[in-house]
Curated annotation (Swiss-Prot):
Family: Belongs to the GroES chaperonin family.
Primary role: Together with the chaperonin GroEL, plays an essential role in assisting protein folding. The GroEL-GroES system forms a nano-cage that allows encapsulation of the non-native substrate proteins and provides a physical environment optimized to promote and accelerate protein folding. GroES binds to the apical surface of the GroEL ring, thereby capping the opening of the GroEL channel.
GO biological process: chaperone cofactor-dependent protein refolding
Xref: HAMAP family: CH10
Domain of life: Bacteria
Localization annotation: Cytoplasm
Protein's name according to its UniProt entry: Co-chaperonin GroES
Xref: InterPro entries: Chaperonin_GroES, Chaperonin_GroES_sf, Chaprnonin_Cpn10_CS, GroES-like_sf
Chief subcellular location: cytoplasm
Key words, A-Z: Chaperone, Cytoplasm, Stress response
Gene symbol of the encoding locus: groES
């Protein structure tokens, strides 16, 4: 299992639509980069200048929206994940 460090979060991407509302199948090159994902694991939190640790606002299982070009894509045990900082998360869905 991936365990992120500090204020980082591991997410599993929610796949982009394969076809448009009118039924046109989109090739991979035409798909938008996904901006939604499910939080799989969270780090221990951000450390302030005084040494105090601040817990992250998201938790495993949360569905989130994140910045379009944020994070680092990794493949672990055949599954694609994205590791990003909490500051790149824009919203929690629901």
């Amino acid at each position: 299992m991936l365990k992120p460090l500090g204020d980082r979060v591991v997410i599993e991407l929610v796949q982009a639509e394969e076809k448009t509302a009118s039924g046109i199948v989109l090739p991979d090159t035409a798909k938008e980069k996904p901006q939604e994902g499910k939080v799989i694991a969270v780090g221990t939190g951000r450390v302030l200048e005084n040494g105090e640790r601040v817990a992250l606002e998201v938790a495993a299982g949360d569905l989130i929206i994140f910045s379009k070009y944020a994070g680092t894509e990794v493949k672990y045990e055949g599954t694609d994940y994205l590791i990003l900082r909490e500051s790149d998360i824009l919203a929690v869905i629901g």
